[in-house]
Amino acid sequence: MSVELWQQCVELLRDELPAQQFNTWIRPLQVEADGDELRVYAPNRFVLDWVNEKYLGRLLELLGERSEDVTPSVSLLIGSKRSSAPRAVQPASPPPAVVQAAPVAIEEASAARTVDAQPVAPATVRTERSVQVEGGLKHTSYLNRAFTFENFVEGKSNQLARAAAWQVADNPKHGYNPLFLYGGVGLGKTHLMHAVGNHLLKKNPNAKVVYLHSERFVADMVKALQLNAINEFKRFYRSVDALLIDDIQFFAKKERSQEEFFHTFNALLEGGQQVILTSDRYPKEIEGLEERLKSRFGWGLTVAVEPPELETRVAILMKKAEQTKVELPHDAAFFIAQRIRSNVRELEGALKRVIAHSHFTNHPITIELIRESLKDLLALQDKLVSIDNIQRTVAEYYKIKIADLLSKRRSRSVARPRQVAMALSKELTNHSLPEIGDSFGGRDHTTVLHACRKIAELRETDADIREDYKNLLRTLTT
């Protein structure tokens, strides 16, 4: 079997996966042919296990479809194709079912690796751009040039938001107006907003693009009232090509500011100018905000930005390490991503601490170094999210007793919440499958594994389960 055939199948898989998943898990693989067998090398155990569980089955299907009468034989190894004398190891979990494929050997090739962890301070460059309109009023729009579409890591949690933002940036005035992005802190809403502004200016350097926090809008209005210059204030904000306002929830209970923004908003939309807004919650849930504003925010497209899933968290860490010219091993990124789950800001903050610790101690980035540099943060995470806490939260959410989760009852009203609780325990704690099973009435690890896979399937097909899981995840991690 040829390497070229493998590469063809990899290219087909590339079309099926988000870019960051492909770059994180598939691109690092190396391959060489040995007669009818292909040897595929992963850089470490974490990549090997993940590829084996998530992607190898599909790759074998593609190989089987294109290798005619030859049954594809693939060995998955740890190391590189320059390594010699591979030694067999047992897989951490059974490989996925494949179609007409020979058993996959999972092996390990010894390969020494060193990490040169020299931190480079990330550049944060802001574009201070004065926008001037008739009447002489000037305003400096602080767009952060570091926030672009190119360095935004896309995943399931932000895929729709990113696509909508790109549509607005590439086709302003004819896309979604207004575009309303909402979600918790540190999830990428501001990044997308800056990315839109930067792209608009790249396409048209003379465009009047204004980015500001909602409190700045309030401060400008108050100052205009004090200076008896409210007409200039109105003229300025209603003449821009794109108005980008962050954290719109701060307009709550500010009646005069809401009144002025209401008329500004109407004028901009009537003039075909683009409006992008962000908030930490769905517009209908912003208390103290006038109903007419909530209604108008729904005229365009409202998109949620969710906390990133594990694959996206790993990709974010690898991307950040690449930007700062630090070599971050995959297993180290995986270790951090498994434990820091709440938002991107905390994830990047944890990575900065690890890089600094590596630099000051002159030691490479390893799991041991990460444990030491993040010991207070990891201890807090373990304290906040425990299996007991998950069981209590799930029981309250579904209005059942904790004893029901631990019982042998198999009715749907109990079995499904139990499976949800097991899946959350696997995602949010560091306990092994047997430990989780033992915490749920002495069940074995295969029951936990089945529950996790079942909930993963239902989250793709059942809107109610997907919403339940999202709500519980938010409750447990915020």
Swiss-Prot record:
The entry marks the following residues as binding ATP, namely G186, G188, K189, T190
Q: Which family does it belong to?
A: Belongs to the DnaA family.
SUPFAM superfamilies linked to this entry: P-loop containing nucleoside triphosphate hydrolases, TrpR-like
Gene3D superfamilies given in the database record: 1.10.1750.10, 1.10.8.60, 3.30.300.180, P-loop containing nucleotide triphosphate hydrolases
Q: Name one GO molecular function term.
A: lipid binding
Q: What does its UniProt record remark on the domains?
A: Domain I is involved in oligomerization and binding regulators, domain II is flexibile and of varying length in different bacteria, domain III forms the AAA+ region, while domain IV binds dsDNA.
Region Domain IV, binds dsDNA, annotated ranges: 359-478
Specify where it is mainly localized.
cytoplasm
Instruction: Tell whether Thylakoid is among the UniProt keywords.
Output: no
> For the region Domain III, AAA+ region, what residue ranges are annotated?
142-358
Known HAMAP family for this protein?
Answer: DnaA_bact
| Stored CDD domains | AAA, Bac_DnaA_C
Q: What PANTHER family does the record tag this protein with? A: CHROMOSOMAL REPLICATION INITIATOR PROTEIN DNAA (PTHR30050:SF2)
Tell me how this protein assembles.
Answer: Oligomerizes as a right-handed, spiral filament on DNA at oriC.
Its annotated function is as follows:
Plays an essential role in the initiation and regulation of chromosomal replication. ATP-DnaA binds to the origin of replication (oriC) to initiate formation of the DNA replication initiation complex once per cell cycle. Binds the DnaA box (a 9 base pair repeat at the origin) and separates the double-stranded (ds)DNA. Forms a right-handed helical filament on oriC DNA; dsDNA binds to the exterior of the filament while single-stranded (ss)DNA is stabiized in the filament's interior.
Which keywords does this chain's UniProt record carry? ATP-binding, Cytoplasm, DNA replication, DNA-binding, Lipid-binding, Nucleotide-binding
Q: Per the record, which residues fall in region Domain I, interacts with DnaA modulators?
A: 1-90
NCBIfam families in alphabetical order: DnaA
A Gene Ontology biological process noted in the UniProt record is: DNA replication initiation
Q: Which InterPro entries match?
A: AAA+_ATPase, Chromosome_initiator_DnaA, Chromosome_initiator_DnaA-like, Chromosome_initiator_DnaA_CS, DnaA_C, DnaA_dom, DnaA_N_dom, DnaA_N_sf
Question: Which species does this protein come from?
Answer: Azotobacter vinelandii (strain DJ / ATCC BAA-1303)
Cellular compartment(s): Cytoplasm
**Any single GO CC term annotated in Swiss-Prot or TrEMBL for this entry:** cytoplasm
Stretches for region Domain II: 91-141
In Pfam terms, one family for this protein is DnaA_N
Q: What is the protein's given name?
A: Chromosomal replication initiator protein DnaA
